Regions:
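Helix-to-loop junctions at the C-terminal end of transmembrane segments
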Residues: 53-64, 149, 256-270, 353-354
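A late C-terminal transmembrane helix in Major Facilitator Superfamily
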Residues: 326-356
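Structural signature of the two symmetry-related core transmembrane helices
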Residues: 67-81, 272-287
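Transmembrane alpha-helices of Major Facilitator/SLC transporters
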Residues: 47-51, 244-265
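Intracellular juxtamembrane helix-capping segments at the cytosolic ends
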Residues: 105-118, 310-324
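Cytoplasmic helix-loop-helix junction between adjacent transmembrane helices
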Residues: 97-132
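Symmetry-related core transmembrane helices of the 12-TM Major Facilitator Superfamily/SLC fold
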Residues: 156-173, 363-378
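Helix-loop boundary and gating motifs at the non-cytosolic
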Residues: 1-46, 206-208, 212, 217-235, ...
């Protein structure tokens, strides 16, 4: 149990983030705000995250991890206490964007810190535990927020966030600074010293996986930030039903992360089909979301998207960290590219939903984007697979 304690900050922070995003979407309905407004609001927050993820990741390489982790927890505490006090749209504009800065302080730093920690497992096994914990948090947060909409005080989830953030800070503050004895060798083995990692493919797969992860998080940001408002306000979907969709998607993600942390998954590393086919099936399911609303079809689509998102996220993070000495910088690039998707998704999706007066139009956008980027990924594969350029380290 003691070895699992370092993973709990990921669960708590994403639990907080999931509640803040979902509850803000529900909260916006009481303020009569449009989908475009919410999209811009979420995107502005993500812009701060995207701009600062790489600098903060590099800064953590120089000054240590725990200071930035504590600052991220402190900032999300202040934001969660300020959001219930907002009475107008411009109040939200003043408060909500700080969520993005708190996440930029936390995630690149935490991912690098975790990748360095000495433990019984290899890098891939530690990534499995990390993914299980953060995915549990980001799944339970929206579900909790959705169910608490029935309570007499729908602002209660915001106060729950402040308590969890303080708990997270206390947990992190008890973790001592890493010493040189605690650090892994920079040549992290994937599974064992005999691992057969293709020397000509690392950069190729970093590029492909980051593009794929961009598409996944573009879509995921719409499902998390716009769907609670659009589905409940314009499609008659109950908040608890939305919570069920998120719970299913998160549960599937957890199962996929368990698979990628196993020895059997090694045969899938540095191969295109395991990364390509989940995206292709998901793109088709997104068109289904855009054309129909039927609870069973949506359950299937959310489950398929859980498979694709887990695959692209694991791939982007794994290919960037394995065997790389600048883990803070690599985690920063991983988070920044992911963040661009989260920035653009609500911004474009909210605008499109209002322009077309169709709450399902953002899903058609996501299906088209993912299909287009699949073509780009195949093009990169065909161009670089036999090129010496793939021997060079990616930024």
């Amino acid at each position: 149990m003691k070895e699992l304690i370092p993973y709990f900050p990921a669960l708590l922070m994403d639990f907080c983030l999931g509640i803040v995003i979902t509850n803000t979407a529900y909260f916006s309905t009481s303020l009569s705000l449009s989908a475009t407004f919410i999209g811009v609001l979420m995107s502005f927050s993500t812009l701060l995250f995207t701009l600062f993820a790489i600098p903060f990741g590099k800064l953590s390489d120089r000054i240590g991890r725990s200071r930035l982790l504590s600052a991220g927890c402190f900032l999300i505490t202040l934001v969660s206490l300020g959001l219930p006090q907002c009475q107008k749209g411009w109040h939200l504009v003043m408060v909500y964007p700080w969520v993005g800065l708190s996440q930029a302080l936390f995630w690149p730093t935490y991912e690098a810190w975790l990748a360095e920690r000495q433990g019984r497992g290899t890098l891939i096994q530690r990534l499995r535990l990390f993914n299980l914990f953060w995915c549990s948090g980001i799944t339970l947060g929206p579900v909790m927020s959705s169910y608490l909409q029935r309570s007499p005080n729908p602002d209660f989830p915001f106060y729950l966030v402040s308590g969890c953030a303080v708990l997270n800070w206390l947990l992190i503050s008890r973790q001592s600074e890493l010493t040189s004895a605690d650090l892994h060798s920079t040549s992290d083995h994937v599974l064992d010293p005999a691992n057969d990692r293709p020397t000509h493919r690392p950069t190729l797969f970093i590029y492909i996986s980051r593009i794929a992860n961009f598409a996944s998080w573009f879509t995921l940001s719409i499902l998390r930030s716009l769907t609670p408002k659009l589905a409940t306000e314009k499609m008659g979907v109950a908040p608890t039903e939305y919570g069920h969709f998120i719970m299913l998607m998160g549960s599937v993600q957890l199962l996929i992360y368990i698979w990628y942390g196993s020895k059997r998954s090694a045969r899938w590393h540095y191969k295109l089909p395991p990364l390509f086919f989940p995206q292709a099936v998901t793109a088709m399911s997104l068109f289904t979301l855009g054309w129909f609303y039927h609870p069973q079809l949506w359950m299937i689509a959310f489950a398929l998207f859980g498979i694709s998102t887990a695959t692209t996220y694991f791939s982007s993070m794994f290919y960037g960290l394995v065997g790389n000495t600048s883990k803070g910088a690599q985690a920063g690039w991983h988070e920044a590219i992911l963040g661009i998707g989260v920035l653009l998704g609500p911004l474009i999706g909210g605008w499109l939903a209002d322009l077309s007066n169709n709450p399902q139009s953002p899903y058609l956008l996501c299906g088209g984007l993912m299909s287009s980027l699949l073509v780009v990924q195949v093009g990169i594969w065909l161009t670089m697979r036999n090129s010496n350029k793939t021997d060079q380290p990616a930024q």
